[in-house]
Amino acid sequence: AVLKDGSCGSIGYGIATAYAKEGANLVITGRNVKKLEAAKQELESLYGIKVLTVQADVCAGCDNEATVANVVKQAVDTFGGIQVLINNAQASASGVPLAEHTTEQFDLAIYSGLYAAFYYMKACYPYLAESHGSVINFASGAGLFGNFGQSAYAAAKEGIRGMSRVAATEWGKDGINVNVVCPLAWTAKLEQFRDAYPDAFKANVKMPPMGHYGNAETEIGRVCVQLAMPDFKYMSGETLTLEGGMGQRP
């Protein structure tokens, strides 16, 4: 099964759709039960797969280890194992300058992103080792390029990148490859960011050289499918920027 943390957003659903079209059974998590159930019904009816939905949220002050352990147990009990783990969930107060950030806003980003990836990777490790599986974590150009107003978000994402590189080193012996994707796609969340923080949006979001924003399924999700395929098994510890030519680095 493919376990996806954070599947109701535009990019998350695009990834789920790409895997569903390959015939993969899915475990999808999120906070909104109605959105999870709607996603389950649509994916199962369109693609003939099985989808397990589990309401789960990693947050400050919660028993996060128990929450994640419950998700993983349900996944294994339902499907017998886990072949792919995708950590896509993230919440943050993007647009708030560092000096104005509150501890609560910082915790929101770190718990929903970095801690969530940590708990899921730790809990899924035995099953990924058994299946010689793949981990695909999500980061962002916010951390790569120091985007204005995104200090907590960037901190969470760069923490995920560092942890992913360590996992690639430690888990290579188990046949697990671990990679990171930094996407740019036009989504409802990006629209909300534009409306809530117009100055930060203008400073950070440009039209990519390719002339369009990425499609969540075909240009982000399909790459995630390939990263778990045998042809890409030897690639591990890498960061891929799927930003239409905007995420160029030395």
Regions picked out by a protein language model, each given a short descriptive name:
Residues 1-27:
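Canonical Rossmann dinucleotide-binding motif of NAD(H)/NADP(H)-dependent dehydrogenases/reductases
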Residues 57-59, 198-218:
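Catalytic Tyr-x(3-8)-Lys segment
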Residues 95, 145, 206-207, 224, ...:
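Short C-terminal tail/terminal secondary-structure segment
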Residues 96-98, 102-107, 201-204:
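Substrate-binding pocket helix/loop in short-chain dehydrogenase/reductase
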Residues 121, 156, 164:
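Active-site helix of classical SDR
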Residues 140:
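Residue(s) in the substrate-gating loop at a strand-loop-helix junction
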Residues 172, 177, 235-237:
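Short, small/polar-rich loop/turn modules that mediate ligand/substrate recognition or access, typified
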